[in-house]
Amino acid sequence: MSCSRPCVCSHGTSVEESTWYGFDFYPNLFYNDWLGTTTLPYNPERIPIRYINRPWPSLCWKVTVAVASLFLLLGVAALTTGYAVPPKLELVNESKFSSMEDPVADYNQALMTCRVVGATLCGVAGIMLAVCLFLIASGWMFQDIKAEPLVTETDSPVEVFRDEPEKLSPAFHETSSQSPFLTPPSPFGQQSVQTSQPQRDL
């Protein structure tokens, strides 16, 4: 029995369309993941399918990663400022004690504050990233995945089942012709019913 549809391997190059179905580009995968959708490039029916995840878990981990990255950058900047800038030495002088002590002490206190704030921000970012990785590993981020046909740009409905003429094998035709439930053909062939009237002799 011949196949009416062209057979295309899932890993390789299609002869008709010259399309590679074995991989996808990383920017395309990142774009689909950011939108919360994943487009399957190949399926046996040649219908593009879009897998939609739940919006809240996807949005939750994206916002968490973004905020954690921002906190991490700010923490690293604060730590770099606190440890890279050298502190000033406090000058002990009785005549200028009241005028020189406050600026130097404030400067050193600001450097110490930068170190503390930087360490706190880095710790919070690490905790947020750890929680996000734990939720991803536990599978909470990837639940309730739904599949639906991908509608083209022309808003035309996707043809799932195409009407094709049924092609049966000769053996099936012979079996169906020899079925006992079928009416046997008449030995006299097709008979036409004719109504005739006797002709009167004039």
From Swiss-Prot:
InterPro entries found in the cross-reference section: Neurensin
Cellular component terms per the entry's GO annotation: cytoplasmic vesicle; neuronal cell body; plasma membrane; transport vesicle
Segments crossing the lipid bilayer: 65-85, 116-136
Comp. bias regions, Polar residues: 188-202
Keywords, in A-Z order: Membrane, Transmembrane, Transmembrane helix
Membrane topology listed for this record: Multi-pass membrane protein
Tissue: Expressed specifically in brain where it is widely expressed, with highest levels of expression in thalamus and hypothalamus. In brain, found in neural cell bodies and detected in many regions of the limbic system, such as the septum nucleus, horizontal and vertical limbs of the diagonal band, hippocampus, amygdaloid nucleus, and habernula nucleus. Also localizes to small vesicles found in the perinuclear region of Neuro2a and PC12 cells.
Region (Disordered): 162-202
UniProt-annotated location(s): Membrane
Main location: membrane
Family: Belongs to the VMP family.
Biological role stated in the UniProt entry: May play a role in maintenance and/or transport of vesicles.
Protein name (Swiss-Prot/TrEMBL): Neurensin-2
Source organism (scientific name): Mus musculus (Mouse)
